């Protein structure tokens, strides 16, 4: 009598195996080999599902559908999300140095509620800031956190990592924009830290006011340059006085004055240059948005279910944190049975 046989999708294509074989039950609910599952998840988190199945076809000469990759990727994204923020990945400091924390939001289009904000955090050491001559600097190693939804869960996730790191570093340095929830969180949770208002975000208020107030381009440019120099030296009150002296009735003048007065304790840029690696701008978190979120999740026409978006964020964070071995480990466990 002929034994029942099953087909498993592998990196060599479909392989028929006996029903009694240990692999016949599949892995995590899929009749797909562990290595093939890993490659499908890797491809799925790198590019849209409509494209990544072509990559697998080209590299392995194995045909898989975009729907297959979607299902496998989503399952692993949900599972790795249970522990994605539990491990510190930064190497210990070689000396007493500053730990930098940046956070910001990015809008993502969801099916259920339209545009929703993804909170993104980036943590890195001062010694990981690399400067090569006059070239733009870069950060050699970072840990990311990404959450779709409210700020309370996001800040708890950030605190879990920061608290594990904080005792090893001489100083915590937060660089953020002026959102009240960020400012209040830092003041409440880390009162002894250095809290910096992103310089470039602050300078945007100068530009917005100058565009409304000055008609002549040369006057506008000259005025902005003068105020930015003062801002760089931490002379916030002087900048505010200069705006008041113009006696502008434009709404941007009021917005600038109120914003600068509310955040002046976080605008001591002349002092911040002497701390750690001397950065006080949001370049690190801006590039993190592009790397972690935009590259994969904000392509033309994309809309996400909220659950699917968080699952993908979990995978993007795992990949960008350099922790892909955690996905490999999951392919070797049995965390999910077939339906």
What are these regions (language model features)?
Residues 1-7:
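An N-terminal, globular interaction/scaffold subdomain
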Residues 8-339:
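Catalytic center-proximal scaffold of phosphoryl-transfer enzymes
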């Amino acid at each position: 009598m002929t034994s029942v046989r099953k087909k498993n999708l592998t990196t060599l294509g479909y392989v028929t195996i006996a029903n009694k074989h240990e692999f016949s039950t599949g892995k995590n609910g899929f009749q797909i080999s562990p290595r093939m599952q890993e490659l499908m998840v890797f491809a799925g988190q790198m590019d849209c599902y409509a494209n990544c199945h072509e990559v697998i076809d080209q590299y392995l000469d194995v045909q898989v559908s975009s729907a297959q990759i979607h299902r496998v990727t989503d399952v692993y994204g949900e599972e790795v999300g249970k522990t994605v923020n539990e491990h510190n990945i930064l190497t210990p400091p070689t000396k007493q140095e500053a730990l930098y924390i940046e956070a910001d939001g990015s809008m993502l289009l969801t099916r259920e509620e339209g545009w929703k904000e993804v909170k993104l955090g980036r943590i890195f050491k001062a010694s990981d800031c690399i400067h090569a001559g006059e070239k733009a600097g870069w950060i050699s190693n970072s840990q990311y956190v990404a959450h779709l939804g409210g700020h309370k869960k996001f800040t708890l996730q950030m605190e879990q990592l920061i608290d594990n790191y904080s005792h090893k570093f001489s100083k915590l340095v937060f660089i953020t924009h002026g959102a009240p929830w960020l400012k209040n969180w830092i003041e409440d949770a880390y009162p002894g830290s250095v809290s910096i208002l992103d310089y470039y975000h602050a300078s945007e208020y100068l530009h917005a006011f100058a565009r409304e107030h000055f008609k002549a381009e040369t006057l506008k440019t000259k005025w902005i340059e003068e105020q930015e120099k003062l801002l760089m030296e931490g002379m916030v009150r002087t900048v505010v006085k200069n705006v008041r002296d113009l006696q502008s009735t434009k709404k941007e003048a009021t917005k600038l004055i109120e914003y600068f007065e509310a955040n002046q304790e976080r605008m001591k840029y002349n002092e911040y240059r002497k701390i750690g690696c001397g950065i006080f701008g949001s370049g690190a978190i801006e590039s993190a948005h592009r790397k972690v979120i935009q590259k994969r999740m904000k392509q033309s026409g994309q809309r996400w279910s909220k659950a699917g978006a968080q699952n993908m964020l979990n995978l993007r964070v795992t990949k960008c944190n350099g922790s892909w071995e955690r996905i490999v480990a999951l392919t070797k466990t049995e965390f999910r049975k077939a339906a």
